[in-house]
Amino acid sequence: MDNDLYLSKKNSIERCLARIKQELETGSDPLSNITHMDAVVLNLQRACEIAIGIAMHAISHHKLGLPQTSRDAFQILTDAGVLSEDLGLRLKKMVGFRNVAVHDYQSVTPKILGLVLRDHLNDFNEFLSALERKWPFPPPIK
């Protein structure tokens, strides 16, 4: 993957995570306010989409296969040893959350969102770190 593209996408994920943390630090319970909850879900959705895009680009660039679905992308990276089994599974579940957020928003309850925020917000950073361990950025000068 082109280094500038990767860094731009990484920066976008970091902005989404910062925005989520900003909403969580408002002092009140952001999950009890629909406007704050919407901001959190929207930024989670954005971070998910960007992570999927990074995965697809990495697979294409390194000729690892041809994913048929977003979940396939994380499975291919797991099979290639880029992601641990555990992280690959969590990222595939993230795709499921993204699908629910996009297509069945009403079922994203404050309780479910709270669990995602508590247990899985760092999955994005773990994903980026795993990619950077496998393919250090910036690439060596040839």
Please tell me what each predicted stretch does:
Residues 1-142:
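Solvent-exposed interaction patches of small proteins and small membrane subunits
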